[in-house]
Each structure stands twice: as C-alpha cells, then as structure tokens.
C-alpha cells in the first residue's frame, strides 16, 4: 500500500478556523503544497525547512499513531497541509477512519481535484487572496465546487487588507449558495510575543468585522478570528 508523507500528527485539540471552528479534533498534517503564499503560517510543509521531519506512513501507521496519541478522546480527524489534495492515495486512510467511526474534515485551496474528496464529511475550500501573491484558477475552482455539489462544503477567505476583502466579495458573489467565512490573517507567524500577537489579531478582527457589517454583499457571511492563534500564539502542534 502506498505511503503518505506526514509532517505532524497531533491532538486532541480544537479546530481554530473555518466551518468547524471550535470542533474537537485530531490533526494529520501532510507535506507538500502547490502554492507558496507570502504569509503562509505552515510554510514548513513546502519550503524544505522541515524535510527531515517528513515520515512516509501507511494508513494503518497513521491510525495507530492517532490512537496512541488521542486514545478514546476523539471522534473527528482533520487532514491539513500544505495541500493534502495533492495526494492521490488518501482514500485508503479515509476508509480506515470511517471504519473506526471517525468524522473527517479537510482544508484545501481548490487548486487540485481528487475523487476521494467526495468521502470527506466537511470540506473547507480556501482560495488565496491577492496578498498571498498566488493566482486563483477560477475555471478549475468552478469545476471543483460543481463536483462537490450536495456535500457539506464552505468557502473561507483569509483577509489581510482592502484588496483581499474585495476579492472575498467577488468570491462570495460568484458562489452565493456556498456557506462563506471571512477570517483574519496572521502576518506575524514568527513572533513568540503572544500578548503582542493577540492584540494585533484582535485589532484586525475588529477591522474585519467593521468591513463586513458595512458591506451588504456580506450579509450572509460569518466573520471569524484565528481562534488557535488567540489561544496558543504561533505554537506548532496544537
């Protein structure tokens, strides 16, 4: 059976972002991404800085480690990255998770399609705004969202500035029937000064709330902070 490149397995913790914010979950963080966002808070998944930490693991190995770490204290697993949608062989892992009664979630930027996405319970698609310096392939994104029709999906846009907010408005208008989340961006992913970081993030959150409540196009949007950053700062593995 083919192996999966894994950088981290951790939890139980709570999901800090998007449609399942606050959900108690275990995390599987895979290596590799087809993007290189300017402000990426998990650049170690693709920039080579953590290449010595990558483990090639079978789905059985991953499940065994989830249980070893989480015991009986979880029923939800989040697959994160990087971009886990780069990997073709996640379906075997999903089968094991389902056999053991797990609900599953994933976040991907909507740049790659895999048939196994249809097996995921909660799918967050997070297209990257202008501040990321990445370009959205809307034709590909259209196709992916169409294939996921009827699934429990959402769109999430991280917002750093006015240009990002304008991008978010256009995204929401393009897919008005897909639940939509605005989220504060963290542009200081290296600091260990948690008090300073929390103040910055809360100031940004207040700014984003003000933008949203004064924009009629965002009447149905939900505005979120980065919950995990407010609790743990930039700490990994939480």
UniProtKB/Swiss-Prot annotation:
Keywords: 4Fe-4S, Iron, Iron-sulfur, Lyase, Magnesium, Metal-binding, Queuosine biosynthesis, S-adenosyl-L-methionine. S-adenosyl-L-methionine binds at residues 82, 126-128. Its cofactor is [4Fe-4S] cluster; S-adenosyl-L-methionine; Mg(2+). One of its GO terms (molecular function) is magnesium ion binding. Catalyzes the complex heterocyclic radical-mediated conversion of 6-carboxy-5,6,7,8-tetrahydropterin (CPH4) to 7-carboxy-7-deazaguanine (CDG), a step common to the biosynthetic pathways of all 7-deazapurine-containing compounds. Belongs to the radical SAM superfamily. 7-carboxy-7-deazaguanine synthase family. This is 7-carboxy-7-deazaguanine synthase. It comes from Bacillus cereus (strain ATCC 14579 / DSM 31 / CCUG 7414 / JCM 2152 / NBRC 15305 / NCIMB 9373 / NCTC 2599 / NRRL B-3711). The gene is queE.
């Amino acid at each position: 059976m083919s192996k999966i490149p894994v950088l981290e397995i951790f939890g139980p913790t709570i999901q800090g972002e998007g449609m399942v914010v606050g959900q108690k979950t275990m995390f599987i963080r895979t290596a590799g991404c087809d993007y290189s966002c300017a402000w990426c808070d998990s650049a170690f998944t693709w920039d080579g800085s953590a290449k010595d930490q990558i483990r090639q693991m079978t789905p059985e190995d991953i499940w065994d480690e989830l249980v070893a770490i989480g015991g009986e204290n979880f029923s939800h697993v989040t697959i994160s990255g990087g971009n886990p949608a780069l990997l073709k062989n996640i379906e075997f892992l999903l089968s094991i998770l389902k056999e053991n009664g797990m609900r599953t979630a994933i976040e991907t930027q909507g740049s790659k399609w895999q048939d196994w996405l249809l097996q995921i319970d909660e799918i967050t698609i997070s297209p990257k705004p202008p501040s990321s310096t990445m370009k959205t392939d809307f034709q590909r994104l259209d196709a992916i969202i169409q294939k996921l029709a009827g699934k429990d999906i959402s769109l999430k846009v991280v917002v750093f500035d006015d240009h990002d907010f304008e991008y978010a408005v256009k995204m929401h208008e393009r897919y008005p029937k897909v639940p939509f989340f605005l989220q504060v961006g963290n542009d200081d992913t290296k600091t260990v000064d948690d008090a300073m970081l929390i103040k910055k993030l809360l100031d940004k959150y207040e700014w984003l709330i003000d933008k949203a409540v004064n924009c009629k196009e965002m009447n149905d949007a939900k505005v979120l902070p980065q919950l995990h950053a407010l609790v743990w700062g930039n700490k990994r593995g939480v």
